[in-house]
Structure formats: structure tokens, C-alpha cells
């Protein structure tokens, strides 16, 4: 065969391509197309193993946080339950003492007056100042001028009560009623544990005890 015929045959072979090469090309295209196809559609409610954590990380975190918060609240309530029942204040101590000692003199003394004034301040916040705020508020808000006026009114009232108490202690240093009730409460403090007395009485508890005491006295 001449060299010219050989060259023509070789060119024709390159243009057509070998059967093996064409088969490899089709196989690669088929494989590449399958790898890029979407995953099969699942029925409603079905998810992949990792889809939930990818699509709902916020809801998952919120549920965990809410659970921890609820557990902490329950632990706090459990740890504090029972303590409030053991705590006392002058109102409760004096009312119990008077119940067993009807001949006791009228209320007086440092513990009585200091607790009474603290009760008056709490009562002013929950009742008088609340009503005044509701009269002045616009969209449940008041300005600084009105706020200052409310605070000064309360200060003026409490200042007068403290001045009256100081005047009494200065001019009646030998008040029998003061000595009696202060001694009652000192003896009470000597009989209770330091752990119980370290627990502070809340304003709500003080107000509730005072109201109960006044109701008992009126009856």
C-alpha cells in the first residue's frame, strides 16, 4: 500500500473516532448526569438524617433553652419552698403574743414603728401611687415632671412619719409600751435561728401580715 493511501486511511480513522473512545465518553456523561440529579422525593413528614438540624436549628435551640429555664425555675421554687413559712416579722410576732396575752399594752416601740412605716411605704406604692399614676399616664407612660411629683409626695409623707417616731423616742425614753414590745421582739429574736432571720421579708409579705393583723384587731 502506498504512503498516500496510508495517510488517507489514518485521517479517516481519526475523524470517525474509535468505538472504545466513544463508549467511554457516553459512560462518563451518563455517570456525571446521575451524580448531579436531585435526591428522590420523599412523602410528607419524611426527612433525611441531617435535614432536621439544618432546617430547624432555632426551634431546636429554643426548646432546649425553654426546658432549661423551666427546670431552673422549678429548682428555685423547690429550694425556697418552706422558708417563707418560717420567716417572721414584728407584725406576726406581736399579734401572736397579744393573742396569748390579752392584757398586753398598746402597740409601740422601735420594732413596731419601723415596721409600721415600712408597711405604709409599701401600701403607698401599691395603692395611692398606683392610682395617681393611672390618672396621669398617657399610653401607660408619664413624664419626668409627674414622676418627680409622685416621688416627692411619698417622701414628704414618710419624712413626717419618721420625724414623729424620732420625736417620740427622744421625749419618751422611758415609754413602758416601747420597752414592753421591744423586749417581746428581742426575746423572739433570741429564740430563732440566725438562718431564718437572715431571710429578708418582702414588701408583699409585710403588707399582707399587717392587713391580717389589723383585721384581727378590729374583730
Swiss-Prot record:
It is found in: Host nucleus. Belongs to the Bocaparvovirus Non-structural protein NP-1 family. Residues 24-41 have a biased composition (Basic residues). This is Non-structural protein NP-1. Required for the expression of the capsid proteins. Performs the splicing and internal polyadenylation of the viral capsid-encoding mRNA precursor, which allows its maturation and expression. Transactivates the viral promoter. Residues 74-87 have a biased composition (Basic and acidic residues). The keyword Nucleotide-binding does not apply. The keyword Transcription regulation applies. Keywords: Activator, Host nucleus, Transcription, Transcription regulation. Residues 1-90 are annotated as: Disordered. Pfam families: NP1-WLL. Residues 60-73 have a biased composition (Polar residues). InterPro entries: Bocavirus_NP1. Disruption phenotype: Abolishes viral capsid-encoding mRNAs in the host cytoplasm with concomitant loss of expression of the capsid proteins. Its main location: host cell. One of its GO terms (cellular component) is host cell nucleus. Residues 7-50 are annotated as: Nuclear localization signal.
Amino acid at each position: 500500500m502506498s504512503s498516500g493511501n496510508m495517510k488517507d486511511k489514518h485521517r479517516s480513522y481519526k475523524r470517525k473516532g474509535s468505538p472504545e473512545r466513544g463508549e467511554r465518553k457516553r459512560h462518563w456523561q451518563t455517570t456525571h448526569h446521575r451524580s448531579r440529579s436531585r435526591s428522590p422525593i420523599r412523602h410528607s413528614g419524611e426527612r433525611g438524617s441531617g435535614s432536621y438540624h439544618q432546617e430547624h436549628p432555632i426551634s431546636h435551640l429554643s426548646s432546649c433553652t425553654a426546658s432549661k429555664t423551666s427546670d431552673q425555675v422549678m429548682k428555685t421554687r423547690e429550694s425556697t419552698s418552706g422558708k417563707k413559712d418560717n420567716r417572721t416579722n414584728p407584725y406576726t410576732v406581736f399579734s401572736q403574743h397579744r393573742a396569748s396575752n390579752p392584757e398586753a399594752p398598746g402597740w409601740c416601740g422601735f420594732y413596731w414603728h419601723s415596721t409600721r412605716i415600712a408597711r405604709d411605704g409599701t401600701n403607698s406604692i401599691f395603692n395611692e401611687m398606683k392610682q395617681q399614676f393611672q390618672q396621669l399616664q398617657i399610653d401607660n407612660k408619664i413624664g419626668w415632671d409627674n414622676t418627680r411629683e409622685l416621688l416627692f409626695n411619698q417622701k414628704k409623707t414618710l419624712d413626717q412619719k419618721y420625724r414623729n417616731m424620732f420625736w417620740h423616742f427622744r421625749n419618751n425614753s422611758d415609754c413602758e409600751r416601747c420597752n414592753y414590745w421591744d423586749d417581746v421582739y428581742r426575746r423572739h429574736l433570741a429564740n430563732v435561728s440566725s438562718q431564718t432571720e437572715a431571710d429578708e421579708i418582702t414588701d408583699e409579705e409585710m403588707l399582707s401580715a399587717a392587713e391580717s393583723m389589723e383585721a384581727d384587731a378590729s374583730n
